[in-house]
Amino acid sequence: MEKKPFVTLDQVKKMAASYPTPFHLYDEKGIRENARKLKAAFAWNPNFHEYFAVKATPNPYIMDILKSEGIGADCSSYTELLMSDAVGLKGHDIMFSSNVTPAEDFKKAAELGAIINFDDVSLVDFYEEIGAPFLETMCCRYNPGGNFTLHNEIMDTPKDAKYGMTKEQMKEAFTKLKAHGVKHFGIHAFLASNTVALGYYPKLARILFELAVELSKEVGVHIAFVNLSGGVGIAYRPDQEPNDIMAIGAAVKEAYDEVLVPAGMDDVAIFTELGRFMLAPYGCLVAKVLHEKHIWKDYVGLDACAANLMRPAMYGAYHHITVLGKENEPCDHMYDVTGGLCENNDKFAIDRMLPKIDIGDYVVIHDTGAHGFSMGYNYNGKLRSAELLLKEDGTVKQIRRAETPQDYFATLDYPGLKDEK
């Protein structure tokens, strides 16, 4: 799959005249088209609902776009709940899935009428102790343990994950919730991250559908929905094939028809909590080349760093890089593409073949629309970059300004720092 930026050099030059690099840029047209494609893939399920994983891109302007496409919010913290409330999401348009949950988070989620997803059976008792109200619809998170395999390949290791409950704990939690007057129940699980295998969702769905039938019979509860959570990934590398969400939706339907329908449970809704799939390809980090260095290797240094995009430094993750204006030139130079942090892992690419790069060139680092800005930080006194939205009509809107030194010092009460520009 060829990786092409959704923005041109001329567009970036115009943006940079008003909003200096580095900045994260999002493509409204791509976001909307992808949201509609996801909904089409699950249109066979009348009550299908996507809850965007706010942690992936916590910006209310992005959430507003998704809300207008009928998409809710998957929240895991108090501040994410506040953001969802601010954009007008309430009630069953919010899923609250957290772990090690503070009392105030549970209370806020209940106040908003969100669907609360309990990560552990002990949290049901904790919820009662803090005096939070039990709602008609509540959910529990399942962890089957062991290894999660697909086509004899280990995709992830739920046995090592801190999330979710065992099957027996699910039964105990459902029994407790039923005693508290809960009438409708949901089952949730997340068993693998960033999968590009078409079989992930269908296999997960089958596991959860079978559990739903078992819990419905043994505990005597109404299973209202199965939440497949996230885990559907994207093709970060040009040689990867992107996920076919239409094929995934069809395969989930096949499992639904084979497991739930014969059990008389054809009213079960399908929920998803996609973050990366929804946003990553429709965001990029735009940066400018500041310096080049030639010692034992050839380096190009950008005005962006790992504080703007942590994934390569933290995970060794691949992000494709395009040198704007040189898309058709041969990639015959090998570079390490770096930022300016005092850390040797502050590298966006290592031994990457690219066109000859010159100081002043603009580069696009692809697929940063999820877990890009949101994982930013202030190490080395670096400041978080702006976020811009390329609107459908071609205009650009700043949806978050860049931080200033004054922002960095805002929580310090120390003479001489408050007024730094």
Give names to the regions the model predicted:
Residues P144-L290:
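Active-site loop/helix belt of alpha/beta enzymes
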Residues L260, M265-K421:
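Charged (often Lys/Glu-rich) extended helix/loop segments that serve as interaction or gating elements
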Residues A132-N147:
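Glycine-rich, aromatic-flanked loop segments that form ligand/cofactor-binding clefts
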Residues I31, K55, S77, A109, ...:
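Conserved, mostly hydrophobic/aromatic
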Residues G72, M95, N117, C139-R141, ...:
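Structured core elements
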Residues P58-Y61, M83, P102, D125, ...:
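Flexible loop/turn segments at secondary-structure boundaries
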Residues M1-E136, K171, L177-A179, K183, ...:
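A charged N-terminal "starter" segment
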